[in-house]
Structure formats: structure tokens, C-alpha cells
């Protein structure tokens, strides 16, 4: 930053001006003196001030060294500054063009001109650097900027070479369009290339090199890549690197440059496969150059087929086909196809033509591929938001000048003519048209030279094309003869025959001389026709069109072979592309950077006055200075000027409505601004401002005014936006209200309809509620079922003995029955789960009793509510009975015991007894003595009961068990209980029989029988009556 401040001080300090010179030649006192002009340039050059203005034209002197004037601090310092606020710099020119592009929407182009070695390529890089630094930092923008910046290393590697005058000379012309969006961020780009010097591929002058990429590949590729390409690092291995021993330049690091190229290719979206194919093509050219030929009986033969095989592999073609195409030529003459062998000279020509064509088309493909990567993704950008940068080869005068120098110098003539048209001529013509008082400035108009070269039917280009296309055997010599014949009298054409004696001594007979605007150049016609025809034998095109290498196949399409049209000559194509370039530049607002080479040695701090003066002359800088000094710095149409600055006067703001239109408005505006008449002139359609300071002051006032107007507009705008917002919100609320009201009304109507439908359906359902389900009562029935289920869930019985059950609608009766049964089972299950073992035993006995006695014996009902007990012996007798059981039963198990009354078989006298039930027998004990009276096995006896309400039991004893003693007649309290235990013990109910009679017979001793009558009375009892027994049961 310190060096920048010191430079700024040197540029602006008055006491430093004598030492550093003036920064704008317009300020030079003796502005008509060439000596003063050169002296000012030299002063600044010696102080490392390489930039100087002529008005808005920037003069750049190549320092041949790195200067610290392109840092980020410099970019910030020059950004958004007026042109003359800062010292001269390429950043100032770029910023001025950039702001005009964005703020005024005027297409711009930066024209960089000068001869070879004057620093044009470096200047174009600095323009790109400033644009990249000033644009946005979004991810997409960064991607575009990276691609724009990385395109330079690629184009320089393949299109630049070391010449005797320049280590990095552009051997092609380049015009780059950069497209911006409305915010000034680059969104894409496009590159046009012009006339690559492809002859350099096969031969170079002494001390010069081939294109950089060949040396970069050999120096920077890793061993694996070199092995794949079959290359060696030694430069003298390859014939096409003719200066191989001296090919390494200390100022150039080819290995680092190759890594930069690889990185740039990756950034610009070249795939790994594409990069491999590109380097393969470059390597194939080196191998092709080493292919030699011998001549056997007039036919060329390849010396080393291995080299052809290697080149064919890298190009992706058949080696045999490539070898045949290099040594033979096929001619199709009106359907007659003839293949003839080539001699050694023609084979070498075919080989070199192939190498040049492959490299030339590879370069064109690279540019196309770059353009695809740089293509803007947005299509809405204004067509005027484009800035062009022209970096084209400078004027060249070599010891030996050929077809390439002729084309390059023709291009420079056209650019010089454009410069004259847009500056010297057009500016003076404009003053005359506008009625501005003006003293004409004389200048050399090179249009006469351009016409000499390109005039139809008469110019050198037409003569060259005519000679190339005519039948017969045209040669370079016949071409020169025709030139001399037609142009000998032209003041800018010199031939050997009519040249002055002193020129004849240095001119050869195969040369002609043109007096260019930049000086006299002698051209050798050798190779003019050949290079113009640009002939590549059809056999080679056919071979390459079938290549496996995708890039080669793309560069040599099959449709080219099918075309019968003769291709345009090289010079015709070049002229057409140049004219197209001129059309592009004419529709843009130019910014000029005129580059000057201080010496031919490429050495820092050396200033050759004579060389610089020569460049100043032919660039027309003195004439440009005189026009600028006498002219006006700024001019604009009244409409544009008024539109931009009308806010500076109340008379013209917001719109001028007075008489006289925009011109009168501008006059009123400058009057209100208080301008002196010397500061401006009023033309017919434009306002001319003499001094930049006047415009800058006006612009500063406008920028200040913009803030005031912006505040007013902002306030009104905010008010308008708030009102619009309010109205929009109000409208939205009204719409929402209407929608809500409509929705609510729809919902209410829907509810009413639904309610009516429900009521209607309910009534119909109610009417048909007992019918089979139909369309009317289905919902009602379903609702009835639902309500019944809900009611049932609340009214379910909770006790087993509670047999009540809620009433069910008709359609639910079946389900009600099932649910009732299931609920009963459920309650029973719950009850059962709560039972103790004793309770469970009781229920088992009770169930057994119910099964046997219910409905069969009248006193069964009285037994239900009483728990069955296994022991019915009174307490006072229990011990004695238990003693009997313990002494008598043994393994038998006591099941039941009770007291009872036994009646004799004769006389029916009653006796107290105890009856015991074991698992095997019935025991009858004496009621007093506790002695066993009977033991009756259960499997031998059975029991008879009556169906009356009595406790009578007759035990039928088989005759073989009791010898004629007969049956036992017993009155047993709780007869149902005792009988149930018997049946439970035996396991079958058949042991007990119930008779439905009023009398019961029983067996007596010796087969005699007795009768027991059964009667019903108020009280139970037993009566003995005349030989029979009467049992009285209750009702």
C-alpha cells in the first residue's frame, strides 16, 4: 500500500511533474512535438509509470518486468472512480467501460493493439483480473469467473509461442465477449479465434519455438503419462521442435505451466477422458514429425513403421490405413477413382499437412469446447450487457515474412482503419455535422492500403484466390507476376522489377513489398498458394473421420467428405471473419489500449527512442492527441443528457415541458448549472463538453442529487407500498370474509338438510322399525341396536341368581338371547372361579341331586336350600360312632353318617339306629349299644324311595345276603341328602329307584311280603295299622 501511495503522490504532486511527466498527453504544453511526446513517455517509463492517457485512450509501455501495481489495493482504489480522479491505469479504463456497461446499458469493447511483444496479452489478462475482482462472489459467479480466468492458460498453451521478439507471442487472434447480468456479475462468455499460425507446428525460424504445449507436455507430464504417450523429455528427439537444443527458455517454466493447464482444463469442465485425448493428439503430432520417407522407384516408403503405429494409436486410427494415406493419394475425377503413390517430397508434404490440420482443428475444437463451458446459463440478460476484449496479434516485420505475416498485418491494417474511423475521422466528421467550429487535423488514412489488399477483383486477396483456383499449374512465381502486372503502379506496392536501385539490392526476385501504415514489409511469395489452398489429401481426411479418438472424429466429420463444394481458401475465410469482427466492434462503444514496445531486446529499463517513435507514428497517436486537444472530451445526444441530468434543475425535473424539445431543455439545464460558454458547445443534435472536469462535477452533483431524489422516491414508494399492502390486505380480508360467510352458510344449509334427512329417515325408520331391514329403517335399526347395547351395558345383571334381563327390540331378540346365555355363563364362570373346594363339592352334590330327584320326589325342593353335610350324628353320640368307625372300617372310607329310625318287618315297631355309608357298604348300628346290626355291601343292594314328601327308604336286601330277614324299612331325615351321597359314592343313579305309587311292598321273612301305605297329611308321621305301616307325608 505504501508503494501505491507514493505512486499516487508522484502522479498528482506538481513538484514531481517535471520528473514523472504528465499523466495525460492532452496536458502536454508542446503537444505537437514528437520529441516532447517521446520525452514524456520516457520520463514516465523510467519511473515505472507505464500508463499514460491521450484523453480516454490509454498508452501502455511494456516494462518487461513485474510491477506491484495490480494488487487488491489497486483494484479497490480504482473501482467506481471517475476516469481522471486516479492516475492512468488499465484498471481505470476497464472500470470506466464496466460502469458504462452496467449503468448506461451500452455494449462495450476494449481494443488492445500494438505490435508483437508490446504486452497485449498481459493487458487482456489485467482487464479480466479487474472484472473478476469487481463482480459478485456468489457460487455461480465464482464459477464463471474461474472459467474466464482459466481460459487464458489453455489458449496461451495451445496458441502462443516464443518468437525472436516475444517469449509469449500470440500466434492467433482472440476476441472474447463477457456477458453480465443486470447487477454486473459475469454469467458467461464467448471466444472467437482468428488464423492460428499452424505452419509453426512443422517449422520455426531459428531461435523460435513451437507452440508452448509441446514443451509443457514434455517437461510437466508425469512418467506414467509420458510412457502412455511414448514420449521422451529430450527436446532434440523430435523433428518438429527444430530448435530443440535451445528450446528451454530460462524465463519460462514449462513444467509449472503444464500443471496450470491441467488445472485450468479441469476447472473449465474438461473430462479426464477429453484431457487424455487432447494430450494424445499433441503427442501424435510429435511422433508424426519423426516419420521419415525413402523413395524407391519414385514411390515413397515409410522409414519406421513403429512411429506410424504409435501415432495411429494415439489418434485412434488404423495404422495400415494411416501409412497408406501418407504414401498414396486418391483422386475422384468425375466418378473415376484413381489411387496413385506419392514420391518422397509429396509424402513429406502430406505428413506436414496432416500435422498442421490436426493441430489447427484441435485448437478450433478447444475454443468451441471453452465456449460451451462458458455459455451463459441465464437467457434473460440484456443483449447489450456484453463487454468484448480484443487481443489480436500485433504488427509483425521479420527478416523473412510469409503468408502468416501478410494475414496478421492485414488484420492490423483493418484494426487501424477501425481506430481511424472511430476516433480521428468520425470525431472530426461529427464536429462538422453538428456545426461545431473546427480546424481539421490531417492524418494518414490507411483505407488505401486496405483496399490494395482486399478490393474485389483488384486486390491482392482476389488475385491470390484467382491464382489458386485457376486451372493449369499455378505457382507462387506466377502469382507474383500477376501482382506485378496489376499493382505495379500502386504507391503502396513495390516489386523487384520496378523498385529503386537501392531496394533492388536487398529484395529478392520472389519477394514483394507493401508500404503498411506501420512501415514497409517485404514478403516472400514462397508458400503463399500452398498455405492459401490449405490442401489436405482426401485419403487422410477419410482415415481421420473414422478415428477412435472422439476429438479427432469430431474435427474431421464424415459430412465434410460428402461435400462436393470446393472449400474456401484460407485468406477468404480470414477476410470474412475479420469483416464479421469489424461489424461486432462497430456496434459497441470502444475503449482503446495502445501497447508500445520500448525495445527489441525484451529487457527491462531500456527505452529505444527511435523504436518508440516509429510505433507512435504508425499508431497515429500524434494525430489522436491533436484531435483530442482541439476537440471535446464528452458528447451526448440531448435526449440522453437530459434524461440523465434533468434532476439537477427545477426547470427540467421531473420532465421538461417547455418549447424547443430536449435541446432547449439541455440549454436551460446548463444555464441553471452555471456553466461558462467555454466549457461546452451546442451542436445540432448533441451537447459537447470540452473538459472532463466539467462532466465530473456534473456527475458528482447528479450522484448527490440522486440520494435526495431517492429519499423522496423512497418515502413515496414506501407510502405507496404500505397503501398497496393495506389495500391488498383489506381485499384479502374481504375475500376471506366472503369465503368464510359462504362457507358458514353452506355448512348451516348442509346441517339443515342433514337434520331434515335424519328426521325424515328417523320417522320412516320408526314406522318400519319392526319390518325387515330396508333403505328406510336400516339406520334406525342400527341406532336402536346401538342404543339397546348401550342400555344393556348399564343394566346387566350382576348376580347368578338374578335371572332378569332387559327388554330387547324385535331385531335384537336373537342377539339378546345369545347375549343372555353368554352373560349367564359368564356370571356362572365368575361365580365358579370364586368357589372354595367345599363350596364346589356342595354344588357337585346339589347338581347330582337335581339331576336325580328334581321332578321325581316331592320333598326335593326343601333340600335345595340346605347345605349337605357328611355328618348328621348328634354330638352326644359322635364319639361312640367314631370309635366304631375306627375299629371296624379299616381301609374303608366314611362317606356319610346319620341317625335314623328302623321299623321291624313284623309289627313295624320303631327302633333308633345309626346309619353309616362307606365307599363299600352301608352300616346300621344300634342306637343304644352302638353295635353293628347290619353291614350291607353297596354292590349287593339297592334303594327304593317314594315320590311323596316323606323320608321313607326301603333297602332291598337280596335273599342270599340276609337269610329271609327281608328288606330294611328306614325313616332317614334328609332323605335327599343321604340318597345323593349314596349315588355319588356308587357313581350311578340306578342304585336308587323312585316309585310313583301310594303303597310300597317290601319283603318279609321266608318270602312273605308287607305293604307300606303312603298318605298325605297336614303333619308328617308314621302309623302302625293292622299288619301294615302308614307313612304320612306333607303336602
From Swiss-Prot:
One of its GO terms (molecular function) is phosphatidylinositol-4,5-bisphosphate binding. Pfam families: IQ, Myosin_head, Myosin_TH1. SMART domains: IQ, MYSc. PROSITE patterns: IQ (PS50096), MYOSIN_MOTOR (PS51456), TH1 (PS51757). Its main location: cytoplasm. Residues 578-600 are annotated as: Actin-binding. In the embryo, expressed in gastric caeca, midgut cells of the proventriculus, and in the mid and hindgut. In the larval and adult gut brush border, expressed in the microvilli. Also expressed at high levels in follicle cells during oogenesis. Residues 857-1035 form the TH1 domain. Residues 696-728, 729-751, 752-779 form the IQ domain. Disruption phenotype: Viable and fertile, but adults have a shortened lifespan. Flies deficient in both Myo31DF and Myo61F are viable and fertile, but adults have a shorter lifespan than single mutants. Flies deficient in Myo61F show normal left-right asymmetry of the embryonic gut and normal, dextral rotation of male genitalia, and the same is observed in mutants deficient in both Myo61F and Myo95E. Mutants deficient in Myo31DF and Myo61F display stronger sinistral rotation of the male genitalia than mutants deficient for Myo31DF. The keyword Protein transport does not apply. GO terms for cellular component: actin cytoskeleton; brush border; cell cortex; cytoplasm; microvillus; myosin complex; plasma membrane. It is found in: Cytoplasm; Cytoplasm, Cell cortex; Cell membrane. The modification Phosphothreonine is found at residue 310. It is a peripheral membrane protein. Changing residue 166 to A: Abolishes the ability to cause laterality defects upon overexpression. ATP binds at residues 114-121. Residues 21-703 form the Myosin motor domain. Belongs to the TRAFAC class myosin-kinesin ATPase superfamily. Myosin family. The myosin motor domain contains the derminants for the direction of left-right body asymmetry. Unconventional myosin that functions as actin-based motor protein with ATPase activity. Binds to membranes enriched in phosphatidylinositol 4-5-bisphosphate, and can glide along actin filaments when anchored to a lipid bilayer. Functions as antagonist for Myo31DF, an unconventional myosin with an essential role in the establishment of body left-right asymmetry. Binds F-actin. Overexpression in larval epidermis causes sinistral twisting of the whole larval body. Ectopic expression in tracheal precursor cells causes sinistral spiraling of tracheal branches, giving rise to a spiraling ribbon shape instead of the normal smooth tube. Ectopic expression in epithelial cells causes increased elongation and a clear shift of the membrane orientation toward one side, so that the membrane is no longer perpendicular to the anterior-posterior axis. Overexpression causes reversal of the normal left-right laterality of the embryonic midgut and hindgut. This is Unconventional myosin IC. The lineage of its organism: Eukaryota, Metazoa, Ecdysozoa, Arthropoda, Hexapoda. The gene is Myo61F.
Amino acid at each position: 500500500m505504501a508503494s501505491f501511495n507514493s505512486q499516487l503522490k508522484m502522479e498528482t504532486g506538481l513538484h514531481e511533474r517535471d520528473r514523472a511527466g504528465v499523466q495525460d498527453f492532452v496536458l502536454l504544453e508542446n503537444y505537437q512535438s514528437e520529441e516532447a511526446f517521446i520525452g514524456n513517455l520516457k520520463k514516465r517509463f523510467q519511473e515505472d509509470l507505464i500508463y499514460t492517457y491521450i484523453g480516454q485512450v490509454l498508452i501502455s509501455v511494456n516494462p518487461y518486468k513485474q510491477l506491484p501495481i495490480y494488487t487488491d489495493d489497486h483494484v479497490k482504489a480504482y473501482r467506481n472512480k471517475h476516469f481522471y480522479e486516479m492516475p492512468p491505469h488499465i484498471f481505470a479504463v476497464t472500470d470506466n467501460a464496466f460502469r458504462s456497461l452496467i449503468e448506461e446499458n451500452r455494449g462495450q469493447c476494449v481494443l488492445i493493439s500494438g505490435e508483437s511483444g508490446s504486452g497485449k496479452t498481459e493487458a487482456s489478462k489485467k482487464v479480466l483480473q479487474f472484472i473478476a475482482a469487481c463482480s459478485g462472489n456468489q457460487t455461480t459467479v465464482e464459477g464463471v469467473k474461474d472459467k474466464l480466468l482459466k481460459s487464458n492458460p489453455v489458449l496461451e498453451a495451445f496458441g502462443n509461442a516464443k518468437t525472436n521478439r516475444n517469449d509469449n507471442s500470440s500466434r492467433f487472434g482472440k476476441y472474447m465477449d463477457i456477458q453480465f447480468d443486470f447487477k454486473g456479475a459475469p454469467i458467461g462468455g464467448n471466444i472467437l479465434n482468428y488464423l492460428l499460425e499452424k505452419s509453426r507446428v512443422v517449422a520455426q525460424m531459428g531461435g523460435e519455438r513451437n507452440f508452448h504445449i509441446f514443451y509443457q507436455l514434455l517437461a510437466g507430464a508425469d512418467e506414467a503419462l509420458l510412457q502412455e504417450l511414448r514420449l521422451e523429455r529430450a527436446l532434440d528427439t523430435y523433428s518438429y521442435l527444430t530448435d530443440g537444443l535451445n528450446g528451454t527458455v530460462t524465463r519460462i517454466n514449462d513444467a509449472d505451466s503444464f500443471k496450470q493447464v491441467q488445472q485450468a482444463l479441469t476447472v473449465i469442465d474438461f473430462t479426464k477422458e477429453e484431457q487424455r485425448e487432447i494430450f494424445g493428439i499433441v503427442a501424435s503430432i510429435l511422433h508424426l514429425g519423426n516419420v521419415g520417407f525413402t523413395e524407391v522407384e519414385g514411390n515413397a516408403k515409410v522409414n519406421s513403421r513403429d512411429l506410424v503405429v504409435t501415432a495411429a494409436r494415439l489418434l485412434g486410427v488404423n495404422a495400415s490405413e494411416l501409412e497408406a494415406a501418407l504414401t498414396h493419394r486418391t483422386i475422384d475425377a468425375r466418378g473415376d477413382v484413381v489411387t496413385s503413390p506419392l514420391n518422397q517430397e509429396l509424402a513429406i508434404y502430406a505428413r506436414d499437412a496432416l500435422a498442421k490440420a490436426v493441430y489447427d482443428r484441435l485448437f478450433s475444437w478447444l475454443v468451441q469446447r471453452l465456449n460451451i463451458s462458458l455459455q451463459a446459463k441465464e437467457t434473460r440478460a440484456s443483449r447489450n450487457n456484453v463487454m468484448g476484449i480484443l487481443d489480436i496479434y500485433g504488427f509483425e516485420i521479420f527478416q523473412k515474412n510469409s503468408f502468416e505475416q501478410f494475414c496478421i498485418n492485414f488484420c492490423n491494417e483493418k484494426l487501424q482503419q477501425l481506430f481511424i474511423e472511430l476516433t480521428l475521422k468520425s470525431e472530426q466528421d461529427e464536429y462538422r455535422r453538428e456545426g461545431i467550429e473546427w480546424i481539421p487535423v490531417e492524418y494518414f488514412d490507411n483505407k488505401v492500403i486496405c483496399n490494395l489488399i482486399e478490393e474485389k477483383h483488384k486486390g491482392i486477396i482476389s488475385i491470390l484466390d484467382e491464382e489458386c483456383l485457376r486451372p493449369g499449374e499455378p505457382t507462387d512465381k506466377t502469382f507474383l507476376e500477376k501482382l506485378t502486372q496489376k499493382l505495379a503502379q500502386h504507391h503502396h506496392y513495390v516489386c523487384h522489377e520496378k523498385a529503386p536501385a537501392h531496394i533492388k539490392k536487398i529484395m529478392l526476385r520472389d519477394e514483394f513489398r507493401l508500404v503498411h501504415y506501420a512501415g514497409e514489409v517485404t514478403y516472400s511469395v514462397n508458400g503463399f498458394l500452398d498455405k492459401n489452398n490449405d490442401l489436405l489429401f482426401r485419403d487422410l481426411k477419410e482415415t481421420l473421420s473414422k478415428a477412435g479418438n472422439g476429438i479427432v472424429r469430431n474435427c474431421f466429420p464424415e459430412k465434410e467428405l460428402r461435400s462436393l463444394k470446393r472449400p474456401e481458401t484460407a485468406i477468404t475465410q480470414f477476410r470474412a471473419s475479420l469483416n464479421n469482427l469489424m461489424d461486432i466492434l462497430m456496434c459497441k462503444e470502444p475503449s482503446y489500449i495502445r501497447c508500445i514496445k520500448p525495445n527489441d531486446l525484451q529487457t527491462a529499463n531500456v527505452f529505444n527512442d527511435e523504436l518508440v517513435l516509429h510505433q507512435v507514428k504508425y499508431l497515429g497517436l500524434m494525430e489522436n492527441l491533436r484531435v483530442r486537444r482541439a476537440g471535446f472530451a464528452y458528447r451526448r445526444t440531448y435526449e440522453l443528457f437530459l434524461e440523465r441530468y434533468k434532476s439537477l434543475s427545477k426547470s427540467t425535473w421531473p420532465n421538461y415541458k417547455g418549447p424547443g424539445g430536449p435541446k432547449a431543455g439541455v440549454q436551460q439545464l446548463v444555464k441553471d448549472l452555471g456553466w461558462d460558454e467555454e466549457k461546452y458547445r451546442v451542436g445540432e443534435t448533441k451537447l459537447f463538453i470540452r473538459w472532463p472536469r466539467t462532466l465530473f462535477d456534473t456527475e458528482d452533483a447528479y450522484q448527490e442529487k440522486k440520494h435526495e431524489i431517492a429519499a423522496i422516491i423512497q418515502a413515496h414508494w414506501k407510502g405507496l407500498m404500505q397503501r398497496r399492502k393495506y389495500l391488498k390486505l383489506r381485499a384479502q380480508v374481504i375475500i376471506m370474509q366472503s369465503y368464510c360467510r359462504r362457507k358458514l352458510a353452506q355448512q348451516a344449509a348442509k346441517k339443515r338438510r342433514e337434520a331434515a334427512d335424519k328426521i325424515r329417515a328417523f320417522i320412516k325408520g320408526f314406522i318400519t322399525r319392526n319390518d325387515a331391514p330396508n333403505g328406510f329403517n336400516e339406520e334406525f335399526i342400527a341406532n336402536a341396536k346401538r342404543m339397546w347395547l348401550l342400555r344393556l351395558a348399564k343394566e346387566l345383571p350382576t348376580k347368578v341368581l338374578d335371572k332378569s334381563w332387559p327388554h330387547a327390540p324385535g331385531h335384537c331378540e336373537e342377539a339378546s338371547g345369545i347375549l343372555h346365555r353368554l352373560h349367564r355363563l359368564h356370571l356362572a364362570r365368575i361365580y365358579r372361579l370364586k368357589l372354595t373346594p367345599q363350596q364346589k363339592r356342595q354344588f357337585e352334590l346339589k347338581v347330582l341331586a337335581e339331576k336325580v330327584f328334581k321332578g321325581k320326589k316331592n320333598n326335593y325342593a326343601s333340600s335345595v336350600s340346605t347345605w349337605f353335610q357328611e355328618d348328621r350324628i348328634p354330638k352326644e353320640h359322635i364319639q361312640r360312632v367314631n370309635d366304631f368307625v375306627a375299629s371296624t372300617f379299616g381301609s374303608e372310607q366314611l362317606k356319610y353318617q346319620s341317625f335314623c329310625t328302623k321299623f321291624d318287618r313284623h309289627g313295624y315297631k320303631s327302633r333308633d339306629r345309626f346309619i353309616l355309608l362307606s365307599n363299600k357298604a352301608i352300616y346300621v348300628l344300634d342306637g343304644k349299644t352302638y353295635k353293628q346290626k347290619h353291614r350291607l355291601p353297596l354292590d349287593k343292594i339297592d334303594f327304593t324311595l317314594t315320590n311323596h314328601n316323606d323320608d321313607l327308604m326301603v333297602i332291598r336286601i337280596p335273599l342270599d345276603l340276609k337269610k329271609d330277614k327281608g328288606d330294611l324299612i328306614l325313616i332317614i331325615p334328609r332323605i335327599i341328602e343321604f340318597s345323593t351321597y349314596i349315588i355319588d359314592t356308587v357313581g350311578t343313579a340306578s342304585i336308587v329307584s323312585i316309585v310313583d305309587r301310594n303303597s310300597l311292598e317290601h319283603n318279609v321273612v321266608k318270602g312273605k311280603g308287607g305293604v307300606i301305605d303312603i298318605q298325605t297329611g297336614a303333619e308328617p308321621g308314621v302309623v302302625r295299622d293292622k299288619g301294615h305301616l302308614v307313612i304320612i307325608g306333607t303336602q
